Structures are given as structure tokens and as C-alpha cells.
Amino acid sequence: MLRGSMVALVTPMQADGSLDWEALHKLVDWHLQEGTDAIVAVGTTGESATLDVKEHIAVIRAVVDQVNGRVPVIAGTGANSTSEAIELTQAAKDGGVDACLLVAPYYNKPTQEGLFLHHQKIAASVAIPQLLYNVPGRTAVDMLPETIVRLSHVDNIVGVKEATGDIARVGQILESAKAGFLLISGDDDTAVDFIAAGGVGEISVTANVAPKLVAQMCELAAQGKVEEARAINARLADVHTAMFLESNPIPVKWALAKMGLMPNGIRLPLTPLDAKYHLQVEQALRAANLL
């Protein structure tokens, strides 16, 4: 079952941008030891936009092999071309993932009907559980609650990652969505309140550096121990902020390198974290006892 803390895993790279398979395997094992409930490979945080198709599928297969059935693996397979999204989703299914995460088409700004037809066609083409992903800050299009509700009744579409931070949407969607439709937060700051409102967990950037704390926070929120969950979230507040001082995953990759978990490699057009932010990220990690 998809629930709890689902890390939006980075894709480790060497300084020259080549993929670091050893670091990837170690990161996966660390997350399993720390209590992460599911792993999302090659999403936004995994730099899917700068991986070619061969690399994209290779990373998915590497994560699936390393996890070896211990927790669910979700693959980012969204694209702004419907046919490409179908191709990636089928390849991810063939690679053994448990579900796919499909970001709303970006840059070409489809209408709500276009969003519906895009996801409907992918769902009809590949028989695997699929999560919608609404992140208008990156895609320039907002998948409205009524569109999400329509899609909830389409076979193979099982949930949505909602990254607007708008808690009111949880109730709006759950009221009319198909029974059992999963609402997953895509915003670390508001995840506790999102879960308390009826969400099943979060896909987290902060979990890259604080897997145990984020897993505990999600579990407490799911148990209704909201104040205890909020206390953990307060401890992580500066980390949440630090992870977005520059475009994700720039800060989180620097943080993981600082923690000694991987090199600080990243691909253009993204660049390593500006030196002016190093101290702020380091202080946030230390304040949360992550360093």
C-alpha cells in the first residue's frame, strides 16, 4: 500500500554528471534502514528532465533491484507528450515498479479537458497503478479538484500527489472521488495538516536528508497524534526552507554530499548550490541533528 513517507529520491551523480550507481544503491539501503515507506525514483528531485530515456529506465531498474520488494517503488514517468508518457510508463511497468507518478504536462499548458484526456489515455494504455501529480509551480498548469475527481473514476488511476499546499483541496477531492482514492502531499511544510485532513502520506524532498524523522512524522499524523507530528515538523522547518533556497534538487544534493552520503554531482542546466547558501543549509541540518 502507498502510504507514509515516500522519498522523492535524488539520482546520485559524479562531478562530471555521470550516474553514481554505488551511491544510489547505498542511498536506497539507508532509506530502508531508516524507515522510509516507499521510494519514488526519477521524479523531479531525481532529475528526470536531464536523464535520457535509457538512463531513466536504468535508474528505475536499479532501484527496483536494490529494494527487492521490501517497500513499494514508484517511478516518475510523466511527460508533456502523451505518447512519451505511455512509453515511459510501459517501460517502468516492465522494470517491475509498483506504481507510476505522472506529472501534469508542463510548458505546453493544456486545458482541463486536455489534462483529463492525457491521463485517461495513459491509464487505458498501461495497466499499472498511476498517481496524478499536480505541481502548478513547475508545470504552469493547475489540475483543478474537479478534474482530479473525474480522473479518480478512471481505471488504473489510484491517487494524486497534490503539491499546491492547499489543504482545502483534500476535502474537496475526497468528497466526490472514487472510494479509496489516495491523496498524497507533495509539500513538506504542510504535510502534517494534509494527512490530518485525510491524506495517506507525503512524497517528500526533506526525507532525502531526514528519512527517520519524516517517517515518524507521517506515522504520528496518520495515527491522529497531530501535535506530536507538528513538533517534528517544527524541528524540520528550517530544513524544509533550506531545501528550496535554490531550485530542487540543488540544495538537497549539496546537503547529502555534506552528510557524506554521495558526491555533489548535478547536471546542467542545474548548477551546484551557490556558496552563499552553504552555511544556511549546514546550520539547518545541524539544528535538526542531521549533521
From Swiss-Prot:
Q: Which reaction does it catalyse?
A: L-aspartate 4-semialdehyde + pyruvate = (2S,4S)-4-hydroxy-2,3,4,5-tetrahydrodipicolinate + H2O + H(+)
Keyword Ion transport included in the entry's annotation: no
Which Pfam families did the record assign?
A: DHDPS
Q: Check the record and name the PROSITE patterns matching this protein.
A: DHDPS_1 (PS00665), DHDPS_2 (PS00666)
Q: What class of enzyme is it?
A: lyase
Record site feature (Part of a proton relay during catalysis), residues: 44, 107
Q: In which pathway does it act?
A: Amino-acid biosynthesis; L-lysine biosynthesis via DAP pathway; (S)-tetrahydrodipicolinate from L-aspartate: step 3/4
Q: Which UniProt keywords apply?
A: Amino-acid biosynthesis, Cytoplasm, Diaminopimelate biosynthesis, Lyase, Lysine biosynthesis, Schiff base
In the record, what terms sit under GO molecular function? 4-hydroxy-tetrahydrodipicolinate synthase activity
- Catalytic positions are 133 (proton donor/acceptor), 161 (schiff-base intermediate with substrate)
Q: Provide the residue positions that the database annotates as binding pyruvate.
A: 45, 203
Instruction: Look up the EC number in the record and give it.
Output: 4.3.3.7
Task: Write out the GO biological process terms.
Answer: diaminopimelate biosynthetic process; lysine biosynthetic process via diaminopimelate
Give the top-rank taxon of the lineage listed in the UniProt record for this protein.
Answer: Bacteria
Where does this polypeptide localize? Cytoplasm
Q: Which GO terms describe its cellular component?
A: cytosol
Q: What NCBIfam families does UniProt report for this protein, alphabetically?
A: dapA
Quaternary structure? Answer: Homotetramer; dimer of dimers.
Q: Which family does it belong to?
A: Belongs to the DapA family.
What functional role does this protein have?
Catalyzes the condensation of (S)-aspartate-beta-semialdehyde [(S)-ASA] and pyruvate to 4-hydroxy-tetrahydrodipicolinate (HTPA).
| Name used for this protein in its record | 4-hydroxy-tetrahydrodipicolinate synthase
Please report the organism this UniProt entry assigns to the protein: Saccharophagus degradans (strain 2-40 / ATCC 43961 / DSM 17024)
